[in-house]
């Protein structure tokens, strides 16, 4: 009798595990700082509906597989070559080209001491402010960012000031929540604002998680979905999941390919 009961229980456990590893992020941005296991099938990250944007391949460094199973990214700038080694980025990972892009352009980096990019880690709001500032070519501003939880001696204060001054990010209830994790939808909203909130065409009819998109984020997600910034080919783009570093890298590379790097 016990053996008969054990079989369906084991089947259910296997199904649960399969469902857990299919996504590339936590289902809620408040659940933690790491993303779940991602799919290891390489996709062409340049293959999207955009045909009029920039060719961001010109931004890429030379990426080669290393003995650890990771990659070495060699970037040439001002006649000098610098090689970045990441043991946690497989050469055939769906985000490998995107990591190459953000590292080559200086928008993102990893832990050079441990040789880790940490692609599955979540991105804090303060970290995203720094990333977008670099990506868009932000410049220092004299404006203050007045939030109850934001001191002017924080390392990210100047970046947050610029983001807030440009209307790209804001707070909630007078607080900025710098250490809070950004969701996929929130990251997309910021980039939509950076793009100047272009007129939206298309629908979310074929987006699997459309019912989970907030009303305030609907235009941004519709824009991202219909312009190929997010697809279901590489991983799950669940609106409320904590966006991962790999996903941010991919968003930025596709944004650049679509309309170029620009300041708000």
Model-derived segments and spans:
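Sec-dependent N-terminal signal peptides of Gram-positive bacterial secreted proteins and lipoproteins
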Residues: 4-26
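Feature responds to low-complexity, polar/acidic, surface-exposed segments characteristic
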Residues: 6, 26-96, 109-129, 133-157, ...
């Amino acid at each position: 009798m016990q053996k008969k009961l054990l079989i369906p229980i084991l089947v259910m456990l296997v199904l649960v595990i399969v469902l857990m590893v299919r996504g590339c992020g936590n289902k809620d941005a408040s659940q933690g700082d790491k993303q779940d296991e991602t799919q290891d099938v390489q996709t062409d990250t340049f293959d999207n509906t955009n045909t009029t944007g920039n060719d961001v391949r010109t931004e890429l460094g030379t990426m080669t597989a290393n003995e650890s199973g990771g990659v070495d990214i060699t970037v040439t700038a001002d006649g000098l070559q610098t090689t970045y080694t990441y043991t946690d980025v497989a050469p055939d990972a769906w985000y490998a080209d995107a990591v190459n892009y953000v590292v080559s352009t200086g928008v993102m980096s990893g832990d050079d001491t441990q040789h880790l990019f940490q692609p599955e880690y979540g991105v804090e709001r303060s970290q995203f402010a720094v990333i977008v500032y670099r990506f868009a070519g932000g410049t220092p501003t004299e404006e203050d960012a007045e939030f109850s939880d934001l001191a002017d001696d924080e390392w990210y204060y100047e970046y947050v000031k610029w983001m807030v001054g440009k209307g790209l990010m804001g707070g909630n209830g007078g607080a900025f929540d710098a250490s809070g994790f950004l969701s996929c939808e929130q990251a997309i909203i910021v980039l939509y604002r950076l793009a100047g909130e272009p007129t939206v065409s298309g629908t979310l009819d074929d987006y699997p998680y459309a019912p989970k998109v907030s009303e305030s984020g609907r235009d941004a997600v519709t824009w991202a979905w219909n312009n190929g910034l997010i697809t279901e080919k590489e991983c799950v783009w669940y609106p409320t999941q904590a966006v991962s570093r790999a996903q941010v890298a991919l968003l930025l590379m596709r944004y650049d390919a679509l309309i170029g790097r620009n300041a708000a």
